[in-house]
Amino acid sequence: MGETLDLVDDNRFTLTLRSTSEAVRQTLSLITTHFAGLISETELATLELVLAETLNNVVEHATPEREQGQASLHIMPQRGGLACTVRDNGLPMPDGQLPPKRLPRVDTIIQDLPEGGFGWPLICMFVQELDYRREGGVNILYFLLPFTQKRDS
């Protein structure tokens, strides 16, 4: 998969991967294994969904047809949730900004229903503190995935 994995003692997760669908699948499997037992099953499923959408967006939109496409992922547990940072060397977001959070229109005939456009609004439904910037040719997306269940202090 061409990745570099760094698991440290405080349950942080850091990984560098090629921007391919196969690498995304393998990354999601590693994340599921790493965080199983550390967060609830619901939180784990949400983390996997949000990261699948995020990383697949990198593969499909930021690094299409780029053999050197690369992404890195850093997940840091903190009070109240998981702080996630995704970096990639792909194309910038359109107009250098986050896309709109709205869902595509579905009040149309079946033949005219959109095939895509649901991933980004889905991400926005589950995360907080969503931030995007581009520095030195690198896209940096940050978000907090809040815990949905109470924790013992």
Where are these regions (language model features)?
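Helix-loop-beta hinge of the Bergerat
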Residues: 8-42
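Conserved beta-strand-loop-beta-strand hairpin that lines the nucleotide-binding pocket
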Residues: 1-14, 59-153
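Bulky hydrophobic/aromatic packing residues
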Residues: 25-28, 47, 54, 66, ...
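Conserved short strand/loop->alpha-helix "switch" segment adjacent to the catalytic nucleotide/phosphoryl-transfer site
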Residues: 28-52, 56, 112-113
